[in-house]
């Protein structure tokens, strides 16, 4: 990451990761080489499933690194669970128990956000993000599910939400 970039900007970190894996994006968030539109989701907050604690977005942009005598700095493995805020993610209400407690207990206390649009910056409240500035003045509406690509994404998220925290290493 360049010194001029803010380490808390997870989008800049994501762009670097995409370049490193050889996947370039064109305007509109589409992957070059793939002509299908990929629905975008905004990261609300992240929970470390090992400890059951919420992580700040700054921690996800640059995870801690431990020295290794053979390879230099090595990023230790960390299981994370991405939580989306809003009523448009009903399949994410099903959770599995994890090391430090149950995510269902934390989720039961979460208020629903005003819409499914979340700010990319760290939210004012740790549980509910601000709206994106462009969305102010316009009502936020959920788009109807028409695309098989979106259905695939939803199915993948269902599978991910039911197994990530349940894995044991």
From Swiss-Prot:
GO terms for cellular component: cytoplasm; nucleus. Expressed in breast tumors with a higher expression level in estrogen receptor-positive cancers. It comes from the Eukaryota. GO terms for biological process: positive regulation of intracellular estrogen receptor signaling pathway. GO terms for molecular function: nuclear estrogen receptor binding. Transmembrane segments: none annotated. InterPro entries: C1ORF64. Induction: Up-regulated in breast cancers. Interacts with 14-3-3 proteins. May regulate the transcriptional function of androgen and estrogen receptors. This is Steroid receptor-associated and regulated protein. It comes from Homo sapiens (Human). The gene is SRARP.
């Amino acid at each position: 990451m360049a010194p001029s970039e803010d380490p808390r900007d997870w989008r800049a970190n994501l762009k670097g990761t995409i370049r490193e894996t050889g996947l370039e994006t064109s305007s509109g968030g589409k992957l070059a080489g793939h002509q299908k539109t990929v629905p975008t989701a905004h990261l609300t907050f992240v929970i470390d499933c090992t400890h059951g604690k919420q992580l700040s977005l700054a921690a996800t942009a640059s995870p801690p690194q431990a020295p290794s005598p053979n390879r230099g700095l090595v990023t230790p493995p960390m299981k994370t669970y991405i939580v989306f805020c809003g009523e448009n993610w009903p399949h994410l209400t099903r959770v599995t128990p994890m090391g430090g407690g149950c995510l269902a207990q934390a989720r039961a206390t979460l208020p629903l956000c005003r819409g499914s649009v979340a700010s990319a910056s760290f939210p004012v409240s740790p549980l509910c993000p601000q709206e994106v500035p462009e969305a102010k003045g316009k009502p936020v509406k959920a788009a109807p599910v028409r695309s098989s690509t979106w259905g695939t994404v939803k199915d993948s998220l269902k599978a991910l939400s039911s197994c990530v925290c349940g894995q044991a290493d």
